[in-house]
């Protein structure tokens, strides 16, 4: 294992635990930092816009007068609403011919499993010329009612 020792010049020397400097190696930390600082100085001198951007604060300054409190604004008069314009749910009853409406009423007292057959039989028995002469009251095309 190596023991690291920091020299006053910013150099790190690695030594063995015995204190021997045979495998000593120097790493210069300040050389990299100095070269970066020199590059930055040259860039600032050559490009004043870059210098302004680098010197600018990270966030915009706060305007303290906005933070003091809300400004009292005069209230705007509210418009009065008419009860006629307020939206209300309106349930439209689907259009049905009299035969289907009567058949629907006839199956309401039945169990749900039996309603389909009873409704079909009701329509078959009651859709005749006696109840609807010349087809009056029945739909003429699909989707009429």
Curated annotation (Swiss-Prot):
Pfam families: SOTI. Residues 1-34 are annotated as: Disordered. It comes from the Eukaryota. One of its GO terms (biological process) is sperm individualization. Residues 12-21 have a biased composition (Acidic residues). Keywords: Developmental protein, Differentiation, Spermatogenesis. Post-meiotically transcribed gene that has a role in late spermiogenesis; required for actin cone progression during spermatid individualization. This is Male-specific protein scotti. It comes from Drosophila willistoni (Fruit fly). The gene is soti.
């Amino acid at each position: 294992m190596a023991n690291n020792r920091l020299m006053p010049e910013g150099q790190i020397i690695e030594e063995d635990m015995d204190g021997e400097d045979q495998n000593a190696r120097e790493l210069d930390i300040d050389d990299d930092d100095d070269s970066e600082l020199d590059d930055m100085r040259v860039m600032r001198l050559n490009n004043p816009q870059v210098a302004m951007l680098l010197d600018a604060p990270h966030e915009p300054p706060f305007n303290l007068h906005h933070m003091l409190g809300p400004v009292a604004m005069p209230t705007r008069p509210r418009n009065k609403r008419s009860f006629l314009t307020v939206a209300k749910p309106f349930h439209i009853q689907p259009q049905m011919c009299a035969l289907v409406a009567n058949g629907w009423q006839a199956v309401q007292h039945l169990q749900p499993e039996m309603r389909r057959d009873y409704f079909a039989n009701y329509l078959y028995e009651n859709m005749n010329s006696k109840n609807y002469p010349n087809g009056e009251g029945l739909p003429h095309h699909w989707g009429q009612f």
